[in-house]
C-alpha cells in the first residue's frame, strides 16, 4: 500500500465558544482503513497561549510545524501509524494518528521528541477500529463542498 499525502482543509467551531478551528484531514487512505491493521487512535494535543482568534503565535506555530514534520516522518517511516488529521484553534492543536501498536507508538514518540525541550503535550488513546473520528472529520470536507 502506498501512502499518499493529499489533504483537505475545513473550518469548524469550538464546542464551547464561537472561535474557529482549522481542520486538515488526509484523504486517499481507504486501503489503510480497509486493511484492519490500524485499530488504535492516538491524539496528541498541544495547548498554547492563544491570540484573539484562538491561534498560536508565530514562534509557537513554527515549533509546532517542526514537531509535526518529525512526528509524521517517524511514525510513517515503517507504517507504524498513519497521520490522519490536524485540528488547530481555541488554544490547542491536536494531531491524530491511527496506529498498529500503542506501546511501539509511545516508544517512537519519546525517541522522536527527545531532541526537543519538554513540550506541553497530552496524549489520548482509544480503540477505534471503525475509524469513527476520521469519518466524522471527513464529514467537514463534505459540508464545505
Predicted regions and their residues:
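Charge-rich, low-complexity segments
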Residues: 1-84, 100-106, 134-140, 144
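Conserved short beta-strand edge segments in small beta-sheet-based binding/regulatory domains
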Residues: 114-145
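Short cationic amphipathic helices and targeting signals
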Residues: 93-98
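A short, structural micro-pattern
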Residues: 36-38, 91, 117
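Helical (often loop-to-helix) elements that flank the catalytic cores of nucleotide-handling enzymes
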Residues: 103-118
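A short beta-turn/loop motif at secondary-structure boundaries
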Residues: 85-90
Amino acid at each position: 500500500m502506498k501512502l499518499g499525502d493529499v489533504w483537505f482543509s475545513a473550518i469548524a467551531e469550538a464546542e464551547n465558544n464561537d472561535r474557529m478551528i482549522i481542520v486538515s484531514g488526509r484523504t486517499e487512505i481507504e486501503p489503510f482503513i480497509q486493511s484492519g491493521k490500524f485499530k488504535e487512535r492516538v491524539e496528541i494535543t498541544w495547548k498554547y497561549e492563544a491570540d484573539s482568534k484562538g491561534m498560536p503565535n508565530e514562534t509557537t506555530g513554527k515549533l509546532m510545524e517542526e514537531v509535526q514534520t518529525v512526528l509524521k516522518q517517524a511514525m510513517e517511516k515503517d507504517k507504524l501509524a498513519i497521520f490522519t488529521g490536524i485540528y488547530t484553534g481555541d488554544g490547542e492543536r491536536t494531531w491524530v494518528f491511527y496506529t498498529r501498536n500503542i506501546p511501539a507508538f509511545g516508544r517512537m514518540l519519546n525517541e522522536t521528541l527527545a531532541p526537543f525541550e519538554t513540550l506541553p503535550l497530552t496524549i489520548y488513546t482509544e480503540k477505534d477500529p471503525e475509524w469513527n473520528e476520521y469519518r466524522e472529520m471527513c464529514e467537514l470536507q463534505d459540508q464545505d463542498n
